[in-house]
Amino acid sequence: MNNNTTAPTYTLRGLQLIGWRDMQHALDYLFADGQLKQGTLVAINAEKMLTIEDNAEVRELINAAEFKYADGISIVRSVRKKYPQAQVSRVAGADLWEELMARAGKEGTPVFLVGGKPEVLAQTEAKLRNQWNVNIVGSQDGYFKPEQRQALFERIHASGAQIVTVAMGSPKQEIFMRDCRLVHPDALYMGVGGTYDVFTGHVKRAPKIWQTLGLEWLYRLLSQPSRIKRQLRLLRYLRWHYTGNL
């Protein structure tokens, strides 16, 4: 077994995170020895850390997820501050999803897509098939009624999907994945937020240079000034970081 099929864990404010060195490490870990892992992937950023602190239900949901990873640069910096020897890098959820889809297409892994607007979901399916020949065994947009959830879980189970990606925003997508796993446990679940919108070009992502510099949050703020309240809320996380309350 090579070093890429295992990964250390680090604890921030009671939350255990997987420490991936880079994207290749993440992929090799998830596909260790050619066998796709089963469980739930959850991207962790500063905003989600605050939600975990303030919402007991969300904290329980995310603690139960097997694969929590550093999606935000602030999380990476906090891990490195608390664990100076840590070799951990940011793995952006949107990038990880694309890499998973490319790998799934190559290996014929069955995929079920959940969430998003109907037109965005349709475009996502078409692009995945055209770009990577992804074996999409089913899909459902995010506009279904609560009473339709159980039937959807059964559809996912009947499809035999080995990867289920859910774009519903947090904590709705974590609740959905938790409940769906009771019916269809043998799969890798991934909460992907607005990834389908980015993938299909409906939402513009920060240029690579902004991402590399860890300034994607600033690009979003400049693009969407209405996010200012959300960004100001993150000052609380900065206080934890700079006072070492991690």
From Swiss-Prot:
EC number per UniProt: 2.4.1.180
One term of GO molecular function: lipopolysaccharide N-acetylmannosaminouronosyltransferase activity
Keywords: Glycosyltransferase, Transferase
Top-level lineage group: Bacteria
GO biological process, one term: enterobacterial common antigen biosynthetic process
Database matches in Pfam families: Glyco_tran_WecG (PF03808)
Pathway the protein acts in: Bacterial outer membrane biogenesis; enterobacterial common antigen biosynthesis
Catalytic reactions on record: UDP-N-acetyl-alpha-D-mannosaminouronate + N-acetyl-alpha-D-glucosaminyl-di-trans,octa-cis-undecaprenyl diphosphate = beta-D-ManNAcA-(1->4)-alpha-D-GlcNAc-di-trans,octa-cis-undecaprenyl diphosphate + UDP + H(+)
Family assignment from sequence similarity: Belongs to the glycosyltransferase 26 family.
Primary role: Catalyzes the synthesis of Und-PP-GlcNAc-ManNAcA (Lipid II), the second lipid-linked intermediate involved in enterobacterial common antigen (ECA) synthesis.
Protein name as annotated: UDP-N-acetyl-D-mannosaminuronic acid transferase
Organism of provenance: Shigella flexneri
Phylogenetic lineage: Bacteria, Pseudomonadati, Pseudomonadota, Gammaproteobacteria, Enterobacterales
